[in-house]
Amino acid sequence: MNDFWQHCSALLERELTPQQYVTWIKPLAPVAFDASANTLSIAAPNRFKLDWVKSQFSGRISDLARDFWNAPIEVQFVLDPKAGMRSAAAHAAPAAQRAPLTPNGPAATVAAIAANLAANAGAAPSAPADVPMTASAAAAHHLNADDADIDLPSLPAHEAAAGRRTWRPGPGAAPANGGEADSMYERSKLNPVLTFDNFVTGKANQLARAAAIQVADNPGISYNPLFLYGGVGLGKTHLIHAIGNQLLLDKAGARIRYIHAEQYVSDVVKAYQRKAFDDFKRYYHSLDLLLIDDIQFFSGKSRTQEEFFYAFEALVANKAQVIITSDTYPKEISGIDDRLISRFDSGLTVAIEPPELEMRVAILMRKAQSEGVNLSEDVAFFVAKHLRSNVRELEGALRKILAYSKFHGREISIELTKEALKDLLTVQNRQISVENIQKTVADFYNIKVADMYSKKRPANIARPRQIAMYLAKELTQKSLPEIGELFGGRDHTTVLHAVRKIADERSKDAQLNHELHVLEQTLKG
């Protein structure tokens, strides 16, 4: 096995650039070879490298393995943080004793976390050295007995002895194993179903997924904060839950909280009403991972923004990870304090675009498979071609198809699909949305959908944006102010200027007229 890897590494070093070899191949290490099953296991030090090597180099490594052993070899990639050390001692533990790396489904996720908890029973959860030990990593208590909306951590024994309020487990709480894992999900508010394993990846979200995996492997180090933005139903919430679930697997006892921005606002209000800001701060400032969804809801709420600013500063200082989502680029969120915007910009900001056709097909096929249904590619392509906006719309359409098939006792076909979705397809054909126009024009001119909302003014971005505004006025019932709002909050006079400019040029420019005709036909189906 080691002889093969030396041979393989030498060949790859000659084939790749020095940077590629050092970045992707050198950190790998062979960990097991099963001659009876013809399988070779290769370890990568983190999930980001594992996924990239698997997608880019697995074919070449498999070919080299086949040539070396004169037999087909199945190359498997596994996660091992010690892979880069290339030490036999780092891989001495039998594979059967290692915890599963990628559990299947929520039940396996809970079971894996329960196993981690059992293995670490009696040991205090690890925490960054500079996190004050005044907050426990155990669980949460309520500000008042009648208030179940603000979950705060329990206090250490010496603080409880001093007369401070302590957390008491609710009815049915279990101290260990599966019950403890369930309790961790209740405290963190994570959805165990949303993992990296069932997140469908395509061009529209591959950068966001890669960044999310890197953050999950190196929380508080790689990109802090991580800011994901994009329209509704594109997978932002799925990705941040996946990060939290991965950290729960990797670090039993991690203090994690997922919260929607509206709930955070509510928590601030209740803490203010009950004069409980000390408890509020103690909780939010002591987390290992804070996941804030839809932060645009902070707009205009100055007290909430102030408290979040202090929490953000404390968490980053303690090397805790902060992850934020929004429906738009940070600088374009109205009503948010400039100092918060600057903090958002200090990390990594990644857009998630609407899914392309192939990705929409993959989403439908994956969802159908999870429902135990064999969906043909023809049906998946038919649905994907007609529904283009977001994942939620696709999943809703699939549910209608499955229900229609079940109620009528018929196999799923394109004909049945047309019947099941006739109302939805009629609406799609009759109504062209501004969002679809933006996506179609962005695809046509090879720019990002996010550029439609941005303040960027290069000609290769400004002109497609003007064309999209023109088409929005021509093909929808939206008013000029409404169109301007959908293009990053622009004034109606900006939209009017774009409409007049493109209309005038269309009458004189045959090439532009042809492009507009193609776009119109595409949008009208």
From Swiss-Prot:
Q: Which Pfam families match?
A: Bac_DnaA, Bac_DnaA_C, DnaA_N
Q: Which GO terms describe its cellular component?
A: cytoplasm; plasma membrane
What does the entry's free-text domain comment contain? Answer: Domain I is involved in oligomerization and binding regulators, domain II is flexibile and of varying length in different bacteria, domain III forms the AAA+ region, while domain IV binds dsDNA.
What this chain does, per the record?
A: Plays an essential role in the initiation and regulation of chromosomal replication. ATP-DnaA binds to the origin of replication (oriC) to initiate formation of the DNA replication initiation complex once per cell cycle. Binds the DnaA box (a 9 base pair repeat at the origin) and separates the double-stranded (ds)DNA. Forms a right-handed helical filament on oriC DNA; dsDNA binds to the exterior of the filament while single-stranded (ss)DNA is stabiized in the filament's interior.
**Subcellular localization, per the record?**
Cytoplasm
GO terms for MF: ATP binding; ATP hydrolysis activity; DNA replication origin binding; lipid binding
User: What name appears for this protein in its UniProt entry?
Assistant: Chromosomal replication initiator protein DnaA
Task: Tell me the segments the record calls region Domain IV, binds dsDNA.
Answer: 406-525
Kindly state a single biological-process term from the GO annotations of this entry: regulation of DNA replication
Query: Could you tell me the gene encoding this protein?
Result: dnaA
* Annotated stretches, region: Disordered: 160-182
Of which family is this protein a member? Belongs to the DnaA family.
Organism of this sequence: Burkholderia ambifaria (strain MC40-6)
Main localization (coarse): cytoplasm
What UniProt keywords apply to this chain's record, in alphabetical order? ATP-binding, Cytoplasm, DNA replication, DNA-binding, Lipid-binding, Nucleotide-binding
- Domain I, interacts with DnaA modulators as annotated region, ranges: 1-71
Q: Which InterPro entries match?
A: AAA+_ATPase, Chromosome_initiator_DnaA, Chromosome_initiator_DnaA-like, Chromosome_initiator_DnaA_CS, DnaA_C, DnaA_dom, DnaA_N_dom, DnaA_N_sf
**Residues covered by region (Domain III, AAA+ region):** 189-405
Q: How does it assemble?
A: Oligomerizes as a right-handed, spiral filament on DNA at oriC.
